[in-house]
């Protein structure tokens, strides 16, 4: 474990470097240093929830500097606009291995104006996406990025899209909801993003059919435990702790928040705030949060180990790798995931 005073000094120096004047090229060049510092900080004993929040905070700072620098270079239209963080970035739950999920919202008074404004924003958004990729944030394979015309929209266009997803949900709509409904204003006119969230919650609270479909969709992820409560491995003798671990808590937190009208997008805050609203016992809430945090910690530890070995860091964990205590806690954490799914079945009559 690194010396705490050394870590503090590195962190202070890095924050100063991130705040110092410089070109977008200078900012991108800081990315490896940010990543190295984060590996050391996370390895110093932080729990999973605190570690992913710390990673997201540093990534936010780097991203905002890139956006602000490029906004000064481009001829942007004189309208209110905001860069939206989506998915794990929106939730403040990023791990070391992450790609981009983002969008852009702007103000326009008509569809014709929206088309004209979008044409001016797209070159800027596309360069931001590319510079973020240069800094280590991989381009989204599903093209959910602000540089895609489909996700560079006026407020009215976003509103119509959200209404379509909630009122007439299809499989693709449910998939999009798992990314876009975790939106967080990151840079610019935050009130545009907050107003969009207000609209979203007003619809989801009043649409039980959508809540039911979201809950049913979340239950498709099967907790990797045998009937006897032992770890169930895939054909590679691994467990995908993202798809069949942390995602279960993320999906459940989102559903509970959209049902209760909770504004938070962070999973822990959603589980605690929405859980209180719907009457989840405090002990049950604490168990869910502790389990989620432990699974995140294991994912981060696996990514660090694979990065040190110069391998590709994925979400799969070979359960023989953790200490016996970690293995036992993983089993208990997955049992909490199963209990959370049972809670969804009960609440939504599934």
Regions found by a protein language model. Give the residues of each.
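Feature representing long, continuous alpha-helical segments
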Residues: 104, 126, 130, 246-250, ...
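N-terminal regions immediately upstream of nucleotidyltransferase
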Residues: 1-67, 71-74
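Conserved catalytic core of two-metal-ion nucleotidyltransferases
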Residues: 30-39, 52-65, 73-80, 114-178, ...
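Alpha-helical scaffolding flanking metal-ion-dependent phosphate/phosphodiester catalytic sites
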Residues: 161, 167-182, 248-257, 296-301
């Amino acid at each position: 474990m690194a010396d705490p005073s050394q870590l503090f000094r590195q962190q202070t120096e890095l924050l100063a470097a991130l705040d110092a004047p410089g070109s977008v090229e200078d900012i991108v060049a800081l990315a490896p240093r940010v990543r190295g510092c984060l590996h050391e900080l996370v390895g110093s004993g932080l729990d999973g929830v605190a570690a992913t929040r710390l990673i997201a905070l540093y990534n936010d700072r780097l991203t905002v500097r890139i956006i602000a620098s490029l906004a000064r270079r481009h001829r942007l239209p004189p309208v209110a606009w905001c860069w939206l963080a989506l998915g794990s970035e929106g939730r403040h739950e990023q791990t070391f291995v992450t790609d981009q999920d983002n969008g852009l919202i702007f103000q326009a008074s008509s569809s014709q104006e929206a088309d004209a404004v979008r044409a001016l924003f797209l070159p800027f958004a596309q360069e931001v996406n590319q510079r973020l990729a240069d800094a280590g944030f991989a381009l989204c394979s599903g093209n959910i990025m602000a540089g895609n015309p489909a996700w560079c929209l006026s407020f009215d266009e976003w509103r119509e899209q959200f209404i379509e997803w909630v009122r007439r949900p299809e499989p693709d709509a449910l998939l999009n909801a798992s990314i876009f409904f975790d939106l967080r204003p990151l840079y610019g006119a935050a009130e545009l993003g907050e107003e969009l969230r207000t609209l979203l919650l007003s619809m989801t609270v009043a649409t039980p059919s959508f809540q039911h479909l979201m809950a049913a969709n979340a239950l498709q992820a099967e907790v990797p435990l045998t009937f006897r409560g032992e770890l169930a491995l895939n054909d590679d003798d691994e467990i995908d702790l993202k798809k069949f671990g942390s995602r279960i808590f993320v999906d459940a937190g989102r559903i509970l928040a959209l049902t209760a009208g909770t504004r938070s997008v962070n999973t822990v805050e959603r589980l605690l705030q929405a859980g209180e609203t719907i009457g989840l016992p405090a002990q049950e809430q604490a168990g869910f949060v502790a389990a989620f945090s432990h699974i995140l910690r294991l994912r981060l530890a696996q990514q660090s180990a694979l990065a040190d070995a110069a391998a590709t860091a994925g979400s799969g964990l070979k359960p023989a790798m953790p200490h016996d205590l970690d293995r036992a806690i993983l089993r208990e954490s997955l049992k909490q995931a199963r209990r959370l799914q049972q809670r969804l079945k009960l609440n939504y009559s599934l």
